[in-house]
């Protein structure tokens, strides 16, 4: 997925006050009554809002070509909110709205357009508050306490559609086929679009569109839709509506299949860190019943227990799956954390910005690669030594890259607050329950703890145990590494208190936390070491790294680590720096089933390729891990991905990036190339239980 910035919409306003696209030379909505046009063409054209009452599932999925001003979305949201108010016991509880937009509007232009509809003001304000930056790809926005999921895919719809994951196949209940008129936007209205619509639509799903153009009608019919001409809006004589009578076969990549959970009414989460808490909340938003087991006496005793952690994206300038994931993860994390703060969830934090310094030739080369992309300045910007120093409050000694939306937060505070929120929502917590064994018995998982604790049974289990993930029989083949890290807590001084931003070099230094008048500086990186004792050598090394990277200035001498205040945690790391999230793969079954995968794909006939079975996994066993040093950035999105997968929902990343997060990816990559798969060496793993 191309994460490069995209062009925003250029607008003019006609005499009626209607926005006009300069790119397409067409109006965004009717000069007569845009709101009524939306009701007639898109809602009524698909049978809504009347269809809400008879919808048989908890979630209804809409897809749209051309988000524009968001009028269709806002109108649907308002009607759904009214429906939920009038029918609180109805089966339908959530909307999922997927929209593709090539030229997203600036938020100021959105506000001007929304001013025409005061009846939508409360909904429009919430949308604008979370309006994403113009970065290509999917922006997942959660609204109405999770009752509304908005996936905004920025980019050309014809470029995006081939990249979509299998999770969107046969999912859409209703299409709003919008976009500008075919005569104004001929590139969009084509066979590829119509076929993709059919592939993504569930049997019985519908569409509506303002146009009645013959080639559109024929294209939709050829794709598999039954198409009908009906009365158009206002002076327009006709428009098209239709239904997909039967499921359309969609090609898949079965080796990266992401199965849903069979049962979400009895889920056990094993783990007590930030990703465990976020996963619990993401599941609860969908109605899941969650029980959590933590080995410690309270949450955040592992890698999530630090006082301050930096929040900023991981870029590499390669426009690959890693950069795509962390760009999406960072922007999603900021939206999630801001929403929590608005809800009154308190945790120490400062969105003060993060500056990454080019302190030597190697780091300078990396930053130059990152800046090959002309990022929006609100996301990342090249800055000189003078500019960075002015923002930081201290001489940074180097130029570098600045992330204005970054900052720091207290992982321990946040994890405790999230756990409390999940408990308020109904989650049961069992602390001091250290999982000893995991065994599948009949249709449940048996969880065995200490000798004095009774075994527990659950239908579905999620492993989120950090560096301990490889300890279980089902997961010990996964290529995960334990990495010790010691963070030093240093008292502030009049000079250090001037630091206004997080500085990243061959380490990091945070601004002072007003709550305790200390900074955090770190962190050591000891691969394969799971000890958490204090080490004087690592304490001193944390200081020395800062001095080595900024020898031109004197203020780093103010850093005093002599009181030996520190905290040590153990990260769970992966060599490709991407998390693992999804169903736990069955190692032995994967190797047996896919031993000739490369041959079948390269030399087998179409029928043989189509007969390839989905990747073997342990039933009803899921995992999230490998967040490494970037858990604050990645945890919200991986939690959302896992919950969406378990509920069988569309996922908020493209297929290539999701494949790069799949727990079986290292094995599958080798099998696809016909190479042998090597398991973890016994020397690199703890005892498997």
UniProtKB/Swiss-Prot annotation:
It is found in: Cytoplasm. Residues 270-689 are annotated as: FAD-dependent cmnm(5)s(2)U34 oxidoreductase. Its cofactor is FAD. InterPro entries: FAD-dep_OxRdtase, FAD/NAD-bd_sf, MnmC-like_methylTransf, SAM-dependent_MTases_sf, tRNA_MAMT_biosynth_bifunc_MnmC, tRNA_MNMC2, tRNA_S-uridine_synth_MnmC_C. Keywords: Cytoplasm, FAD, Flavoprotein, Methyltransferase, Multifunctional enzyme, Oxidoreductase, S-adenosyl-L-methionine, Transferase, tRNA processing. One of its GO terms (molecular function) is flavin adenine dinucleotide binding. Its EC number is 2.1.1.61, 1.5.-.-. One of its GO terms (biological process) is tRNA wobble uridine modification. It catalyses: 5-aminomethyl-2-thiouridine(34) in tRNA + S-adenosyl-L-methionine = 5-methylaminomethyl-2-thiouridine(34) in tRNA + S-adenosyl-L-homocysteine + H(+). The keyword S-adenosyl-L-methionine applies. Residues 1-245 are annotated as: tRNA (mnm(5)s(2)U34)-methyltransferase. It comes from the Bacteria. It holds the Pfam family Methyltransf_30. Its main location: cytoplasm. GO terms for cellular component: cytoplasm. In the N-terminal section; belongs to the methyltransferase superfamily. tRNA (mnm(5)s(2)U34)-methyltransferase family. Catalyzes the last two steps in the biosynthesis of 5-methylaminomethyl-2-thiouridine (mnm(5)s(2)U) at the wobble position (U34) in tRNA. Catalyzes the FAD-dependent demodification of cmnm(5)s(2)U34 to nm(5)s(2)U34, followed by the transfer of a methyl group from S-adenosyl-L-methionine to nm(5)s(2)U34, to form mnm(5)s(2)U34. NCBIfam families: MnmC_Cterm, PRK01747.1-2, PRK01747.1-3, PRK01747.1-5, tRNA_MNMC2. This is tRNA 5-methylaminomethyl-2-thiouridine biosynthesis bifunctional protein MnmC. The lineage of its organism: Bacteria, Pseudomonadati, Pseudomonadota, Gammaproteobacteria, Enterobacterales.
């Amino acid at each position: 997925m191309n994460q490069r910035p995209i062009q925003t919409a250029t607008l003019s306003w006609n005499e009626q006050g209607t926005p006009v696209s300069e790119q397409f030379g067409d109006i965004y909505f009717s000069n007569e009554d845009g709101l009524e046009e939306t009701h007639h063409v898109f809602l009524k054209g698909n049978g809504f809002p009347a269809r809400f009452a008879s919808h048989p599932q908890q979630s209804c999925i809409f897809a749209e070509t051309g988000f524009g001003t968001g009028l269709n979305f806002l109108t649907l949201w308002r009607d759904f909110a009214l429906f939920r108010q009038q029918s609180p016991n109805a089966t339908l509880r959530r909307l999922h709205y997927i929209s593709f937009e090539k030229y997203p509007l600036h938020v100021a232009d959105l506000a001007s357009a929304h001013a025409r509809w005061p009846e939508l003001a409360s909904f429009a304000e919430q949308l604008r508050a979370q309006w994403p930056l113009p970065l290509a790809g999917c922006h997942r926005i959660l609204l109405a306490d999770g009752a509304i999921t908005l996936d905004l895919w920025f980019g050309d719809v014809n470029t995006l559609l081939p990249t979509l994951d299998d999770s969107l196949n046969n999912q859409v209940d209703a299409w709003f086929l919008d976009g500008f008129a075919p005569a104004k936007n001929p590139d969009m209205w084509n066979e590829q679009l119509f076929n993709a619509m059919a592939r993504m639509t569930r049997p019985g799903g519908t569409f509506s569109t303002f146009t009645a153009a013959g080639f559109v009608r024929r294209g939709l019919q050829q794709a598999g839709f039954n198409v009908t001409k009906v009365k158009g809006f206002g002076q327009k004589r006709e428009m098209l509506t239709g239904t997909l009578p039967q499921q359309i076969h969609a090609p898949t990549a079965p080796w990266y299949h992401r199965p849903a959970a069979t049962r979400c009414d009895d889920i056990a989460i094993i783990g007590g860190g930030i990703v465990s808490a976020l996963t619990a909340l993401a599941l609860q938003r969908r109605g899941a019943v969650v029980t959590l087991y933590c080995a410690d006496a309270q949450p955040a005793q592992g890698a999530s227990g630090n006082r301050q952690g930096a929040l900023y994206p991981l870029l590499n300038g390669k426009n690959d799956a890693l950069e795509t994931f962390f760009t999406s993860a960072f922007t999603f994390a900021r939206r999630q954390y801001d929403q929590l703060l608005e809800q009154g969830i308190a945790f120490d934090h400062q969105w003060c910005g993060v500056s990454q310094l080019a302190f030597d030739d190697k780091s300078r080369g990396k930053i130059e690669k990152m800046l090959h992309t002309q990022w929006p300045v609100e996301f990342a910007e090249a800055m000189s030594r003078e500019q960075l120093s002015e923002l930081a409050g201290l001489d940074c000694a180097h130029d570098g890259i600045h992330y204005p939306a970054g900052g720091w937060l207290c992982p321990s505070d946040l994890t405790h607050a999230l756990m409390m929120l999940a408990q308020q929502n109904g989650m049961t917590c069992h602390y001091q329950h250290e999982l000893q064994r995991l065994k599948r018995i009949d249709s449940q998982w048996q969880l065995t703890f200490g000798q004095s604790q009774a075994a527990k049974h659950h239908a579905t289990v999620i492993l989120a145990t950090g560096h301990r993930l490889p300890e279980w029989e089902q997961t010990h083949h996964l290529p995960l590494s334990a990495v010790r890290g010691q963070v030093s807590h240093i008292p502030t001084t009049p000079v250090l208190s001037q630091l206004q931003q997080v500085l990243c070099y061959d380490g990091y230094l945070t601004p002072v936390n007003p709550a305790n008048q200390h900074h955090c500086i770190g962190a050591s990186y000891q691969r394969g070491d799971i000890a958490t004792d204090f080490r004087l050598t690592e304490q001193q090394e944390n200081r020395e790294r800062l001095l080595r990277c900024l020898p031109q200035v004197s203020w780093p001498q103010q850093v005093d680590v002599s009181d030996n205040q520190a905290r040590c945690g153990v990260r769970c790391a992966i060599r490709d720096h991407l998390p693992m999230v999804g169903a736990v793969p069955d190692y032995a079954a994967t190797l047996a089933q896919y031993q000739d995968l490369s041959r079948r794909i390269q030399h087998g006939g179409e029928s043989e390729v189509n007969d390839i079975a989905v990747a073997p996994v342990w039933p009803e066993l899921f995992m999230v891990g490998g967040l490494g040093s970037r858990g604050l950035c990645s945890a919200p999105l991986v939690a959302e991905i896992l919950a969406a997968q378990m509920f069988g929902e569309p996922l908020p990343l493209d297929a290539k990036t999701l494949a790069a997060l799949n727990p079986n990816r290292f094995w599958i990559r080798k099998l696809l190339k016909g190479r042998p798969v090597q398991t973890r060496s016994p020397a690199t793993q703890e005892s498997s239980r």
